[in-house]
Regions:
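Extracytoplasmic/secreted proteins, especially bacterial periplasmic and envelope-associated proteins
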Residues: 56, 60, 64, 86, ...
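Bacterial N-terminal signal peptides that target proteins for export
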Residues: 2-15
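N-terminal, active-site-proximal structural segment of metallo-dependent hydrolase catalytic domains
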Residues: 8-11, 22-94, 107-111, 281, ...
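Structured beta-strand-rich core segments of catalytic domains in phosphoester-bond hydrolases
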Residues: 54, 72, 76-159, 256-261
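Metal-dependent phosphoester-hydrolase catalytic domains
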Residues: 30, 181-190, 197-290
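Preference for well-ordered, secondary-structure-rich cores of eukaryotic proteins
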Residues: 87-93, 111, 171-175, 182, ...
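Active-site beta-strand/loop signature of hydrolases that rely on acidic residues for catalysis
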Residues: 40-47, 61-84, 118, 143, ...
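Short, solvent-exposed loop/turn segments at secondary-structure boundaries
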Residues: 53-56, 130, 164-169, 270
């Protein structure tokens, strides 16, 4: 008799579990799993288009990115031409990522130059805008993706390059922020690229008001703009300045770590690019600190 009662009790418990699941909604595949790390790894890199030995540089870049496996990759100075397959497409194919290429050049042109976003998951939506002034041929791109069950907006840009062009960069930042306002919705956002300016410059102040610059946040108490932290490659004739950044929405993420990557030559002395890359790890701010 006790065994019968125990069996009935077990059946009732299972039945209640099923009914509660149906009524309250079981965890769906669209929700983040309970053990989800709730982190986002991102890399930004200026590719230096097809300068020097692109096939050799490509191999070095692929090897590094494959080992890291970032969730998103932001590329600048991406080139395609009649004899050159789109560099972002090639990298995405080799890494198994989806990509979007953004260019101010007409789609009918054989030679197109611009930026790209690669994602390890699925690209759910995308958009691009040209940035003023139009004769500067700059743009910003956006994709919506999902990382560990959480929606994410990803933006890429490459701003005006002259040292005296702060006002132009400020105008371009305004264009980027307009794009964010029109596309972000309720999902958190990150933006990265080659800003051609230190992150503490007045040109970028409107962006800093809403977005934390990840590398500086990951290295508190040090001068993150010192030459040792540069992203321009001094071995290829550049002044050592850090102008490549990833910004994370302040009320959505906290910075876990950040590093300069792709900053070593291969055995033949070839460098991956004339810029170093930046890798960052972000954690959603609703995840408790450990």
């Amino acid at each position: 008799m006790n065994r019968v009662r125990m069996a009935r009790a077990g059946f009732v418990a299972v039945l209640w579990s099923v009914l509660l699941c149906l009524a309250g909604g079981c965890a769906s595949t669209a929700m983040a799993p309970a053990d989800s790390p709730a982190t986002v790894d991102a890399v930004t890199l200026n590719l230096w288009h097809d300068k020097q030995d692109w096939p050799r540089r490509q191999d070095a870049i692929v090897a590094d990115l494959r080992a890291r496996g970032p969730d998103v990759i932001l590329l600048q100075e991406v080139l395609q031409d009649a004899a050159l397959p789109n560099q972002a497409q090639v990298l995405a194919s080799r890494l198994g990522y989806q990509y979007r290429f953004f260019s101010a050049d007409a789609p009918t042109q054989a030679r197109r130059y611009g930026n790209a976003i690669l994602v390890r998951g699925t690209i759910e939506a995308s958009r691009e805008v040209k940035l003023a002034p139009l004769d500067d041929y700059r743009n910003a791109g956006w994709v919506r993706t999902t990382v560990d069950g959480r929606p994410l907006n990803v933006y890429v840009t490459h701003l005006h390059h002259t040292p005296e062009g702060g006002a132009i960069r400020a105008e371009q930042i305004a264009g980027v922020l307009t794009l964010i306002g029109e596309t972000a919705g309720d999902a958190p956002s990150i933006i990265g690229g080659d800003f051609n300016a230190r992150s503490d410059m007045p040109d970028l102040a409107p962006l800093r008001a809403r977005f934390a610059e990840a590398y500086s946040d990951a290295h508190p108490g040090v001068d993150a703009n010192a030459p040792v932290h540069a992203t321009l490659n001094p071995h290829l004739g550049h002044a050592p300045v850090r102008i490549d950044h990833v910004f994370a929405q302040r009320d959505a993420f906290r910075v876990v770590d950040a590093d300069i990557i792709l900053d070593q030559p291969d055995a033949t002395g070839a460098w991956p690019s004339d810029h170093y890359g930046v890798w960052v790890r972000l954690m959603h701010s609703d995840v408790p600190r450990r």
